[in-house]
Amino acid sequence: SIGLIASIMGIFIVKLASAKEPANALRSGTLLAPVIFVAMAYFLMQHMSLPLEVLYCVISGAVGGVLIGLITEYYTGGNPVKKIAESGETGAATVMISGLSVGMQSVVVPILILATIILVSTSLASSAGITGVYGVGIAAVGMLSTVGITMAIDAYGPVADNAGGIAEMSGMGKEVRDIT
């Protein structure tokens, strides 16, 4: 439940930062929600008298989740996409080859991050006298704790695109298109 509260607070952060560039406002909410979650988890774990290693497992999962999200953002909207589009100038086969290679490259770092989270959380939990599998489970909770804000932001994109398309097709002014 503290993950949900952190996600709601992250959504409010997006609302407060909406005067900025929209992508930066969304990113700030996505990055601050896990920080809020970890702070709340710290107080909850202190109240429950759990060892600090459990909190470190949560932190490893939360950090890993943020890193995987940033890597995904890069591979779905950064230079790799532009390079795939540029490869279309030479034909369909090069688009398929470059798309396949970028797709294969895009999973390497997230897999390494997941493996690191598993190793770190297993060793942390074991050092606290808890089974390593419990540490991995707690790290997964940390990773998925702010899924609420992630889903909200992912759902926002298509809605904003559709609103922008409707504004454009209906001949509304540029200022309407700028805010949609």
Predicted segments with their positions:
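Hydrophobic packing and interface segments
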Residues: 1-180
